[in-house]
């Protein structure tokens, strides 16, 4: 029995008296048919119209009509109960409860006991006089005594309870008639609960006792009566009633004794326990009594020894309660005698405790075996048995038993004890850790502490797959040793995870060894800041020569020159001047400010022991000093030492690019990209390299990678204007290298008859040096390829059809149609300069003659931010262009030339659309036996539309529609009135 059984709470429930007054109508739901009203058909025929009229008037709150009609009907059939109820309901509906009450009381005289009338009468509220003082209560009682009724007795009693005048309420029950009525019984119940609430325990006891004498006390009330006596601490009354045979059930004895214990009435309780020997009906009741004896008797051991146990199951309790005292006092003989009173197969646990206390190892082992056989799943029994086996020098059997029972599922504390014991036994008997047993022992257990224990077992501690299975969840509860084991296993396969494990171990057990492990691992994963911080935690005394150079190397990688130099000074003091790494680090002190000194140190390092790092560092200086051949040589030497070093391959690829060896550059950059797949600069360079080599599929492949990389960055943070421009440039590159065919249409249509103008300011446009009212040209070009005649050139073939208005001044360019087919060559990679040879043939057979034209054209100042290409950033951009064009007609020996300079502003109006106001000046020349020339200027505006873009291709098509006003400043044979002209311009690039 537990101590908290003394805290039994005794509760009482109070009875709340409420009056439920009906708010429904006085009349039942009677109906209006003859049968429901109890009328003959004739009488119903006569009365129904007036009844219907009355009901409608009542519904419409027409009091006069409703009451008049209902009263008339009642006069006609005064004994009819349903119609009387309708009239009473009407009275109540219009607030005449007194008239309704008189009507119903009169009708009850005619029909005594009618339930319908009584219900309706009872539903009428009765005004209850408010009683708020004792004087008013006594006056009410006096009035009721003069003319007693059940109602007034009940009201006086309830008012007395409310005013806590229990004697007055009790006096009402002296009226036998009232006491026997339902109202009287209610008052008695309320009085009892009120007495309990006010803790007038004697009053409550009297009422319960009266009920017992009247044989009206229920079992629940009897239990409540006992609780009242306990709550009021009416001990003498309880003893008196028990002496009369009341409250003599076993539970009452236990409850009263428990209450005495709770109140601290020790002397009274001891006397009560001695004087009373209840007859219990269950072993649990007897065990509770035994607990009280063992806890509160003057001599608990003697009390229990003298007690005659009624239930056999409680004998062990008696022994269990007395045995610890005997053992504590060292009375082992007495304890054994006490146990001898029980059968040999009982109280094995206690017998085991005695054998352990008396150091009887053989008996303890025998009992441990018996206990284990009874409860083989009980870890405590396994603990006892294996311990006793070890005490009896039977460790092999203990180990076998533990291995059989592994894993130890159950109590965590006992499980940990068994695990520690098994680990100790396996250390002593390693041959027991067979592969099969190790496989079982390495299966992860549910608790982190258990898995940590598993990881240190023989056969597992050095087994990385098993360690990863056990500790791979990285529980924060693992100790430093566990994290170290995990770090060693991840060191080669997952170096970043290994660093995390080393850091966890360092947090739990800071030491020079742990700091060193973190430093080396952090350097391996290129977390130089963490590596440097770890090295700085180690004193110079604890650092080896190798550690000093490694620390200086880490400081160099972390960009901390001061820390590097401090460690280098210590290395110099230790005489490490003949170490190649020392001179490589020493060289870093002079980079980039003193390259000559750095070169000397790097050369010294290479002479001591060639290393890839030294060669790469020296190559970097050579490249900065534009000694590209020396840089290439050193980088090739570095690759011989580290053939698979992706960074060195990339550096050599860049150097070969600088030297102009584009093909060799690609051979280095491609394997470098495999090793550094996420290096964006390397991917960009590969796109440029393959463009130079005219490898369209490869160029587009790397351009797509660049675009995807920029798009991925946009998912994280918004793109900068520079990134946005780069994305567009590579989309343009992707589109440009894939282009083979280009179709273009250019036309200018003069709006004024007789006026001449020119719109020749595009490569391959109208013939240079000539002016027309209108001009039109349609051209198709096919790119043959790059690097055809020179490295970086572009060769194309084209064919065009063009016409003008001739000299007759028609508006549309339909005169002098010619066709031209030629070869166009762009010799320079980075300049817009074309040389073309074209065979021209007339198409109408009348005007013009076939001829061969040699043509050179160029465009300047129209690149980058000043180009007419779409700009992805900003709301608009400034553009300019200087166009030069010259032609030689071989057969006719005619020369023509044009120079045009244009400035314009592109204002974005939508995505892929601009409005472009522009101005330009132009000089034209034409020599055919004589020289002709013209200087003109023009202003205009164009609507440019780019279209056809895809995710990877920038706008491949452009349409321009414009209008231009042009003025000729100087011309030969042109009248002043013809020097001004306006014309429409159309340009399509597809």
From Swiss-Prot:
GO cellular component terms given for this protein: cell outer membrane
Repeat (TPR) residue spans along the chain: 81-114, 612-645, 646-679
Per the entry, what this protein does is: (Microbial infection) Allows N4 phage attachment by binding to the viral non-contractile sheath protein.
Record key words, sorted: Cell outer membrane, Membrane, Repeat, Signal, TPR repeat
Coiled-coil segments? none
Which coarse location class applies to the principal site listed for this UniProt protein?
A: membrane
Lineage top rank: taxon:
Bacteria
Biological-process GO terms, alphabetical: receptor-mediated virion attachment to host cell; secretion by cell
Q: Give the matching Pfam families.
A: NfrA_C, TPR_19
Q: Which gene encodes it?
A: nfrA
* Record-given protein name: Bacteriophage adsorption protein A
Subcellular localization is given as:
Cell outer membrane
Can you state the subunit structure given in the record?
A: (Microbial infection) Interacts with N4 phage non-contractile sheath protein; this interaction is essential for viral adsorption to the host.
Q: Which NCBIfam families match?
A: PRK09782.1
């Amino acid at each position: 029995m537990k101590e908290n059984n003394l805290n039994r709470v005794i509760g009482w429930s109070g009875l709340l008296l409420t009056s439920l007054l009906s708010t429904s109508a006085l009349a039942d739901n009677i109906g209006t048919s003859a049968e429901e009203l109890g009328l003959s058909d004739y009488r119903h025929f006569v009365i129904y119209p007036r009844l219907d009229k009355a009901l409608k008037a009542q519904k419409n709150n027409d009091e006069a009509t409703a009451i008049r009609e209902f009263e008339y009907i009642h006069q006609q059939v005064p004994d009819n109960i349903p119609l009387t109820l309708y009239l009473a309901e009407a009275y109540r509906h219009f607030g005449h409860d007194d008239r309704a009450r008189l009507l119903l009381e009169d009708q009850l005289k005619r029909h005594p006991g009618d339930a319908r009338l009584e219900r309706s009468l009872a539903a009428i509220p009765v005004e209850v006089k408010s009683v708020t003082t004792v004087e008013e209560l006594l006056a009410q009682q006096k009035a009721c005594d003069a003319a007693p009724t059940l109602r007034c007795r009940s009201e006086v009693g309830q008012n007395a309870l409310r005013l806590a005048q229990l004697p007055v309420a009790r006096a009402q029950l002296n009226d036998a008639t009232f006491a026997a009525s339902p109202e009287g019984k209610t008052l008695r119940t309320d009085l009892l609960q009120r007495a309990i609430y006010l803790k007038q325990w004697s009053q409550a006891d009297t009422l319960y006792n009266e009920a017992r004498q009247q044989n009206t006390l229920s079992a629940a009330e009897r239990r409540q009566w006992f609780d009242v006596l306990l709550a009021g601490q009416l001990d003498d009354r309880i003893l008196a009633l028990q002496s009369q045979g009341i409250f003599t059930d076993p539970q009452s004895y236990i409850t009263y004794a428990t209450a005495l214990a709770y109140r601290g009435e020790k002397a009274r309780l001891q006397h009560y326990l001695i004087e009373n020997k209840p007859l219990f009906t269950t072993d649990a009741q007897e065990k509770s009594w035994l607990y009280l004896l063992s806890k509160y008797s003057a001599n608990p051991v003697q009390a229990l020894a003298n007690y005659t146990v009624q239930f056999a199951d409680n004998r062990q309790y008696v022994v269990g309660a007395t045995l610890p005292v005997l053992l504590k006092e060292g009375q082992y003989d007495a304890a054994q005698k006490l146990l001898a009173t029980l059968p040999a197969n009982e109280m094995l646990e206690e017998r085991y405790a005695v054998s352990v206390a008396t150091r009887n190892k053989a008996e303890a082992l025998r009992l441990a075996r018996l206990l284990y056989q009874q409860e083989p799943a009980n870890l405590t029994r396994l603990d006892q048995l294996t311990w006793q086996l070890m005490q009896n020098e039977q460790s092999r059997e203990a180990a076998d038993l533990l291995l059989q029972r592994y894993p130890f599922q159950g109590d965590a504390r006992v499980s940990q004890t068994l695990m520690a014991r098994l680990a100790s036994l396996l250390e002593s008997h390693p041959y027991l850790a067979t592969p099969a047993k190790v496989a079982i022992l390495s299966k992860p257990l549910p608790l982190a502490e258990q898995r940590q224990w598993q990881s240190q077992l023989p056969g597992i501690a050095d087994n990385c797959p098993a360690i990863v299975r056990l500790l791979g969840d990285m529980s924060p509860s693992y100790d430093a040793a566990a994290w170290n084991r995990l770090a060693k296993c991840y060191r080669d396969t997952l170096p970043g995870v290994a660093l995390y494990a080393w850091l966890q171990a360092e947090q739990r057990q800071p030491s020079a060894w742990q700091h060193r492990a973190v430093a080396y691992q952090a350097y391996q994963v290129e977390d130089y800041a963490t590596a440097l911080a770890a090295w700085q935690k180690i004193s110079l005394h604890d650092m080896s020569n190798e550690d000093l150079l490694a620390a200086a190397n880490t400081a160099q990688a972390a960009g901390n020159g001061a820390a590097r130099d401090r460690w280098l000074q210590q290395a110099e003091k230790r005489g490490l001047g003949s170490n190649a790494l020392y001179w490589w680090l020493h060289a870093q002190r002079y980079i980039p400010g003193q390259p000559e000194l750095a070169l000397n140190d790097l050369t010294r390092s290479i002479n001591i022991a060639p290393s890839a790092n030294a060669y790469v560092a020296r190559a970097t200086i050579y490249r900065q000093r534009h000694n590209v051949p020396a840089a290439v040589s050193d980088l090739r030497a570095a690759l011989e030492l580290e053939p698979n070093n992706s960074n060195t391959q990339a550096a050599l690829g860049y150097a070969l690019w600088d030297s102009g060896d584009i093909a060799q550059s690609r051979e280095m950059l491609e394997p470098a990209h495999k090793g550094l797949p996420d290096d964006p600069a390397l991917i960009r360079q590969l796109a440029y390299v393959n463009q130079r080599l005219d490898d369209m599929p490869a160029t587009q492949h790397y351009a797509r990678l660049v675009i995807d990389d920029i798009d991925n960055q946009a998912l994280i943070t918004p793109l900068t204007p520079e990134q946005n421009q780069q994305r567009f440039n590579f989309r343009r590159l992707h589109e440009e290298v894939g282009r083979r065919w280009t179709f273009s249409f250019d036309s200018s249509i003069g709006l004024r008859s007789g006026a001449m103008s020119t719109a020749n300011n595009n490569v391959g446009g109208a013939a240079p040096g000539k002016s027309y009212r209108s001009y039109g040209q349609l051209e198709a070009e096919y790119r043959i390829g790059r690097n055809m005649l020179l490295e970086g050139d572009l060769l194309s073939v084209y064919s065009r059809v063009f016409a003008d208005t001739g000299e007759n001044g028609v508006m549309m360019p339909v005169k002098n149609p010619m066709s031209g087919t030629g070869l166009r060559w762009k010799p320079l990679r980075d300049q817009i300069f074309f040389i073309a040879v074209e065979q021209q043939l007339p198409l109408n057979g009348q005007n013009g003659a076939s001829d061969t034209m040699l043509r050179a054209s160029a465009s300047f100042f129209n690149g980058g931010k000043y180009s007419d290409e779409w700009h992805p950033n900003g709301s608009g951009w400034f553009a300019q262009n200087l166009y030069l064009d010259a032609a030689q007609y071989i057969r006719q020996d005619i020369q023509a030339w044009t120079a045009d300079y244009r400035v314009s502003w592109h204002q974005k109006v939508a995505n892929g659309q601009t409005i472009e106001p522009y101005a330009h000046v132009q000089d034209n020349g034409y020599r055919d036996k004589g020289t002709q020339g013209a200087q003109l200027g023009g202003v205009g505006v164009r609507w440019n539309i780019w279209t056809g873009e895809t995710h990877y291709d920038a706008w491949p098509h452009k349409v321009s529609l414009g209008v231009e006003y042009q003025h000729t400043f100087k011309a030969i044979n042109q009248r002043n009135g013809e020097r001004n002209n306006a014309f429409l311009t159309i340009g399509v690039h597809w």
